[in-house]
Amino acid sequence: NYSDIFSQAFENEQEHIFSIQFNADYTDFSARMLWYLGPGKEEWDKFNGLGGSSAPTSFYNKYDEWDLRLEHNLAKTWRGQPFKDSRIAVIKYWDRTGKQMLDHDGLNFPVFRYADVLLMYAEALNEWKGAPTEEAYDAVNEIRLRAGIDEVEDLNYKQFQSLIQDERARELCYEGHRRFDLVRWGILVETVKRVSKEINSKGGEYVSEAHNLCPIPQTEIIKNSNLEQNPGYETTQK
C-alpha cells in the first residue's frame, strides 16, 4: 500500500527504482526530512527556524476524503489538537512506529519510483495521441486504485491533462518533482503567484519567467565568451 513506500520495513522494494540511502546509525548518513517538514513534537511552534512547513488549503482539497494518501501525507491535527492558525502539517516522512528520531532517522528518500513512471507514461500518451488511450487510463487508474479512490474514464485531452497534474501532486508531493512539473507544463509563474497569495507570502512578487531556468554560472561564461546568459539573468554577464 501507499504508506509502505515510506516505511523502513519496505525500503528498496519493487516500487523504488532509485532512492537515496540513509542510515540512522551514522550521523553523517541519516535523513532529516522529518526535521524540516514535521511534525515530531506536540506543538507546532517548536519547529520555528528548522521546519514548520505547512501545506496550502488548495492542495489539501485536491484529495478525495477517502484517498488513503491524504491521511499519510497531510494532517490538520496532532494528537487530537489542531495546529496553530489551522495549519496543515506535512507528515509524509513521519515514522508511524514512533521510533524515529526527529533529526536523526534512516528512512530512504525516493528519487524515482514506479508510480512516477506510470504517471509519465499516461501523460506522454495523452500528449502524443491528443486524448487519453486505454493504456493511459490503465496507468493512472493503477495508482488511484491503490489509493482507494475511483477509476477515471471518458475524459478529453484537457480533462486528462488536468487530472495528471493533480494526480502527480497527490502521489508525488514532497518528493522533489513539482517545480520540474510546473516548468514542463508552462505554469510555474502563475502557480507560484497564486499559491503565494493564498498563503499570504511575498514570494509571488519576485517570481518571473526567468525562473523557468537557472542562470549559467559566471565562471562558465568567463571560460567561454560564446556562451549567452539565460534570459532574465543578463545583468550577471560581464
Regions found by a protein language model. Give the residues of each.
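Hydrophobic, small-residue-rich alpha-helical packing segments that form membrane-like cores
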Residues: 1-3
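Extended, hydrophobic/aromatic-rich amphipathic alpha-helical segments that build helical scaffolds
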Residues: 18, 67, 109-143, 161-175
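Conserved, well-structured core segments that form or line functional sites
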Residues: 148
